[in-house]
Amino acid sequence: YGGTAPNTLLKYALNYAHTGSYTDGKAVLDVCDDAAKINWEGEWRTPNTSEWNELHSECIWTWTTQNNINGYKITATNGNHIFLPAAGYFNGASHYYADIQGYYWSSNLNGSVQLTSYYMYFDANNRIRKDISRGYGLSIRPVCP
């Protein structure tokens, strides 16, 4: 979860249920472990669930292809837009659903189920906010306030 270097697994990826490791009890990603903050520096960071919720409910999502890559063009009421590629996800070295589905981390961890963190899932027909094991390799769309 939130790797700051390729193929790294941080302390958030494991918990007692799977490895016998400790359970950290955190609800929000630490700044020092935020891949967006580490890789982009400055004020960039991984968006939180409130920001994903706003994007989900307040913007227009249009499935499209840009530069031969499927994904959503997300347009705000003021006309600003971003493109989120359907990049799929990684489980270990295996890459799944590229160009079909998108999986994007939020900075919020599921405090009640220590193994999971919240993310935004989408495909051509669905957009769902869910939680998933922190051990998966999902995309990060950095935001800057």
Identify the function of each model-found stretch.
Residues 1-145:
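Conserved positions within compact, well-structured domain cores
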